[in-house]
């Protein structure tokens, strides 16, 4: 098992678990909330078959990584990613983020530049800025964010159950595009996450990424499902595509937020076409 040390909390090292497979151009896959590198299994297989080197890692607080009570913000998440880049001496890299992982992609480029990044991919994006403000009147009100965080604190396991119902649009896709066993596996990974990170990672979703978008200067792919109930497309990717008109923008009709699994074939085709 491979780890990169990204800091310390008191007497304990903070270590991120990662996997590094295959050969060719490196593709770094960054998972969403309460998920880990295994959430990319359908994409990992397709990317390896196409001759790529595929690197996944678990965000601090999740998966097999350390569970600190510090650093649950995008400046730190981007610094963690930079530590992985440094350890593996990554260059000419394709950065691919899903959901919460799109924040690392945006903030990494915004903070560290694109010298080591060849292309960027945003799937189910949080960008540009989801929180309601004078400039974003259609955003999510702070009181709704606070209510969500309170629900996680009260019973995160019950929250995960309702979260995945909308993550996969189970009323539409259970038994056809996703099995009960796959949903259960997602829940089990979520349940293994840090109780602290389970609360504070979602607070970071409402980071303002508009300044980071201004610094994206590499070929970029933005993908989003029109059926996304967790991260509404009108508030995020459609606005993101307007803010970054040079990007390739793809909407996947009817796809839920958890489309890496439910619409894996469509995601893989778009991803491989973009990487070609």
Model-inferred region functions:
Residues 7-11, 49, 55-100, 109-111, ...:
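Active-site loop/oxyanion-hole signature of alpha/beta-hydrolase fold enzymes
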Residues 9-70:
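Conserved HGGG/HGGXW glycine-rich cap/lid loop of the alpha/beta-hydrolase fold
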Residues 106-111, 115-154:
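Flexible "cap/lid" loop of the alpha/beta hydrolase fold
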Residues 128-139, 150-214:
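Conserved alpha/beta-hydrolase catalytic His-Asp/Glu region
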Residues 216, 222-224, 228:
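Short beta-strand/loop motif that positions the catalytic acidic residue
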Residues 226-229, 254-256:
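Acidic beta-to-alpha connecting loop that harbors the catalytic carboxylate
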Residues 229-235:
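Conserved alpha/beta-hydrolase "acid-adjacent" motif
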Residues 246-276:
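Catalytic active-site module of serine/aspartate enzymes centered on a nucleophile-bearing elbow/loop
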